[in-house]
């Protein structure tokens, strides 16, 4: 009923609930229809061949997460795939965390592709998003072991999650949350620097009208 309401506020609430419901329906379909690698030993062997290369595996899975998110164009969908793979024991939590880092880069690249035909301000915002997340991935990779060990300690010892399948889901969620919160707390002090860098890379075009808020003096 909210979708057909004459009032814009109610209609917006209805559209929000409708879209949110479809998001979870899509995630449920992904989980239900995800291929079972245990029944496909060739594919499982292919995946596991690249899980024991040390830090090289971490870098590889960051790249895989980036490319996969660019193809799917939905970080929520790739996050669901990551949760399924870790919960079923196909990859470790550390490699799942690497996929999450890649997903954070991939979701910004899709925004940059969408902004190619937009105005200067939109392209600057998309580039700033990319810079923000790439910097976050770099510093987390430098502290990858301490960060993943800290998340594991929190979930296992503080939250006392016994079931491994549930624990790894909590770990990935906690890792994703920690990544974004810490990245904001670090980069909030460098907003001006990021702005200057982005404006230098993408200069103002003559045909673009400078954006101003209307009715606000």
Where are these regions (language model features)?
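Non-transmembrane accessory domains of multi-pass membrane transporters/channels
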Residues: 181, 188-217
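Transmembrane helix-bundle signature of multi-pass membrane transporters/permeases
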Residues: 18-21, 25, 66-72, 84-88, ...
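Membrane-water interface regions at transmembrane-helix termini and the short interhelical loops
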Residues: 2-12, 115-121
């Amino acid at each position: 009923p909210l979708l057909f309401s004459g009032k814009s506020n109610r209609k917006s609430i209805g559209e929000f609930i409708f879209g949110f419901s479809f998001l979870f329906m899509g995630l449920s379909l992904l989980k239900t229809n995800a291929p079972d690698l245990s029944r496909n030993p060739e594919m499982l062997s292919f995946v596991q061949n690249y899980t024991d290369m040390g830090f090289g595996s971490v870098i590889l899975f960051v790249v895989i997460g980036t490319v996969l998110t660019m193809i799917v164009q939905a970080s929520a969908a790739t996050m669901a795939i990551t949760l399924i793979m870790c919960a079923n024991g196909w990859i470790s939590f550390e490699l799942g965390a690497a996929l999450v880092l890649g997903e954070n880069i991939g979701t910004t690249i899709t925004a940059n592709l969408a902004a190619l035909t937009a105005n200067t301000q939109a392209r600057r915002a998309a580039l700033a998003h990319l810079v923000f997340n790439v910097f976050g991935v770099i510093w987390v990779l430098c502290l990858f072991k301490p960060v993943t060990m800290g998340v594991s300690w929190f979930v296992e010892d503080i939250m006392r999650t016994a079931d491994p399948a549930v624990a790894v889901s909590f770990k990935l969620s906690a890792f994703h949350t920690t990544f974004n919160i810490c990245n904001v707390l670090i980069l909030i002090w460098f907003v001006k620097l990021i702005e200057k860098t982005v404006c230098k890379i993408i200069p103002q075009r003559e045909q673009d009208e400078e954006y101003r808020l209307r009715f606000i003096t």
